[in-house]
Amino acid sequence: MLRSADLNFKNVTLNGKYSFQYIENSVFENCNFATKDAFWHAKNVIVRNSVIKGEYLAWYCENVTFENCLISGTQPLCYCKNLKLINCRMENTDLAFEKSQVEATVDSHIISIKNPLSGSIRALSADSIIQDDPQSCCEIRLG
């Protein structure tokens, strides 16, 4: 599904690399994805009630929303614009949100958050928060 538009997936299970790169204007509901580099450069995408496992999720995406999702894997959601997470859970996620403009409500622990650019992140807890870039102005609230 490279460079596709107007996709509408429901109850789909997918196991494969580089899925949904450069897609636009698409909706995914009740899906289960085991993938690498999914949703890179995606625009105007909504993912609801789904499980996404794999590394480097959704880098360079724009206007992407994850709602009631489980996200698992290293370095997810980096270099994003207008990224939203609504009531999501994260497992085994480290170095998340690097250089992203994000509004996130995460109902779980995050291993590490690295230099989110702007917005706010609410999570139950995090092992480490790395904000060593002076441009990282995101509000991070734990608890």
In which residue ranges do the predicted regions lie?
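Long, distal/terminal scaffolding or interaction modules
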Residues: 1-143
